[in-house]
């Protein structure tokens, strides 16, 4: 296999440049990333030993920022790649399962789909996490894999993702449910960085944009504007709308991906079978996603079960005060005023 050297880093010319590089090569670059990060503004995070770092107008946890810097420099997207983009806790796991099931339904029927045995995150790798930190996982070594994911804001995506013409699906969720899901999810992390702050303190930080991957509303708005400018390249979905009536959106997603369902498949209830396979209820109750079971391909700071809490719409009502609700609703109204977003059905 032919290789070339870029800035003293050996880069494979196979799948996505660094897909076959060893972790030690990332570590050589990691020191440089850490030197950059040391010069950037820091603020207290949701844990006492886990501060946020400002970069590119967004706030980051240091490991994620190291991964971003690496992906920006080395990840090379191809025109036929497909990206699941989202902010944390907005429906990512569900959307990963759907894209994998849609793209691979000619290889597996519902009874043999690998999703029944392993967590969806193993099949759709993060370019800012798996790509830099775990480049030897099977999915990154598979030259035929075209499914990738990221929580990176649109304006900081690797240049090749935007310019290659590869397609993107973005999912967003009510910011109140997103916050509650993030805060409860943080408690499930196997962390040595100290306890998670109270829900009141975390909410205040969240409203200031101090959460992983920066201000949530800016994240949504960035992808919304990109979708408005490039509707053929970006599909924009709303979690609550999909949960209420998944069938038409799964068909729309499949068509957008280039894997549209045939008339015969629709008559054979294949769409319904895909929806059921990837449903919250099905995935949550699989042995692979119960208890403290971990993903099989690499170490993880979360058990597989952490990704399946309730999957419900409106759970924020059990956590937020009227004052909190008014604050986040006001921020949303202000952020999206004049953008056409609030009147959209997406």
From Swiss-Prot:
Positions contributing to 3'-phosphoadenylyl sulfate binding: 89-94, 173, 181, 239, 309-311
UniProt-listed InterPro entries: P-loop_NTPase (IPR027417), Sulfotransferase_dom (IPR000863)
pH effect on activity, per entry: Optimum pH is 9.0.
Reaction equation(s) it catalyzes: an aliphatic (Z)-desulfo-glucosinolate + 3'-phosphoadenylyl sulfate = a (Z)-omega-(methylsulfanyl)-N-sulfo-alkylhydroximate S-glucoside + adenosine 3',5'-bisphosphate + H(+)
Example of a GO biological process term: glucosinolate biosynthetic process
PANTHER family: SULFOTRANSFERASE SULT
Expression by tissue: Highly expressed in roots, stems and mature leaves. Low expression in young leaves and flowers. Barely detected in siliques.
Function as written in the Swiss-Prot or TrEMBL entry: Sulfotransferase that utilizes 3'-phospho-5'-adenylyl sulfate (PAPS) as sulfonate donor to catalyze the sulfate conjugation of desulfo-glucosinolates (dsGSs), the final step in the biosynthesis of the glucosinolate core structure. Substrate preference is desulfo-benzyl glucosinolate > desulfo-6-methylthiohexyl glucosinolate. Increased specific activity with increasing chain length of desulfo-glucosinolate derived from methionine. Preferred substrate is desulfo-8-methylthiooctyl glucosinolate.
Induction: Induced by coronatine, but not by methyl jasmonate or high sulfate concentration.
One Gene Ontology term of the molecular function aspect: aliphatic desulfoglucosinolate sulfotransferase activity
EC number(s) on file: 2.8.2.38
Transferase is among the record's keywords: yes
Keywords: Cytoplasm, Transferase
Keyword Oxidoreductase (UniProt): no
Source taxon at top rank: Eukaryota
Ways its activity is controlled: Inhibited by phosphoadenosine 5'-phosphate (PAP).
Signal peptide start-end: none
Stated name of the protein: Cytosolic sulfotransferase 17
Family statement drawn from the similarity comment of this UniProt entry: Belongs to the sulfotransferase 1 family.
Protein species of origin: Arabidopsis thaliana (Mouse-ear cress)
Location of this chain's protein in the cell: Cytoplasm
Active site feature: 151 (proton acceptor)
Pfam family, one: Sulfotransfer_1
GO CC field: cytoplasm; nucleus
């Amino acid at each position: 296999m032919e290789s070339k050297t870029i800035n003293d880093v050996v880069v494979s010319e196979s799948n996505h440049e660094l897909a076959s590089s060893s972790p030690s090569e990332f570590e050589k670059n990691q020191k440089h990333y850490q030197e950059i990060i040391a010069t950037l503004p820091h603020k207290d995070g949701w844990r006492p030993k886990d501060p946020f770092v400002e970069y590119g107008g967004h706030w980051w946890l240091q490991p994620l920022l190291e991964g971003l810097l690496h992906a920006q420099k080395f990840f090379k997207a191809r025109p036929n790649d497909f990206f699941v983009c989202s902010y944390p806790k907005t429906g990512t796991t569900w959307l990963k399962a759907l894209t994998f099931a849609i793209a691979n339904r000619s290889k597996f029927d519902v009874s043999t789909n690998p999703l029944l045995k392993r967590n969806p995150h193993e099949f759709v790798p993060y370019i800012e996490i798996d790509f830099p930190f775990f480049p030897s996982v099977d999915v990154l070594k598979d030259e035929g894999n075209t499914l990738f994911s990221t929580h990176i804001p649109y304006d900081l995506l690797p240049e090749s993702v935007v310019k290659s013409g590869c397609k993107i699906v973005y999912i967003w969720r009510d910011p109140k449910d997103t916050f509650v899901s993030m805060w409860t999810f943080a408690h499930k992390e196997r962390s040595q960085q100290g306890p998670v702050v109270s829900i009141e303190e975390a909410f205040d930080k969240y409203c200031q944009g101090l959460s992983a991957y920066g201000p949530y509303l800016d994240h949504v708005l960035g992808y919304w504007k990109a979708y408005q400018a490039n509707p053929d390249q970006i599909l924009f979905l709303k979690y609550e709308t999909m949960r209420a009536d998944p069938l038409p959106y799964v068909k729309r997603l499949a068509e957008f991906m280039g894997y549209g369902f045939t008339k015969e498949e629709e008559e054979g209830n294949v769409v319904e079978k895909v929806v059921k396979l990837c449903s919250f209820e099905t995935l949550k109750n699989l042995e692979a996603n119960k208890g403290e079971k971990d993903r099989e391909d690499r170490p993880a700071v979360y058990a597989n079960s952490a990704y399946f809490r309730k999957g419900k719409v409106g759970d924020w009502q059990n956590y937020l005060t009227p004052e909190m609700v008014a604050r986040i609703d006001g921020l949303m109204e202000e952020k999206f005023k004049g953008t056409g977003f609030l009147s959209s059905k997406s």
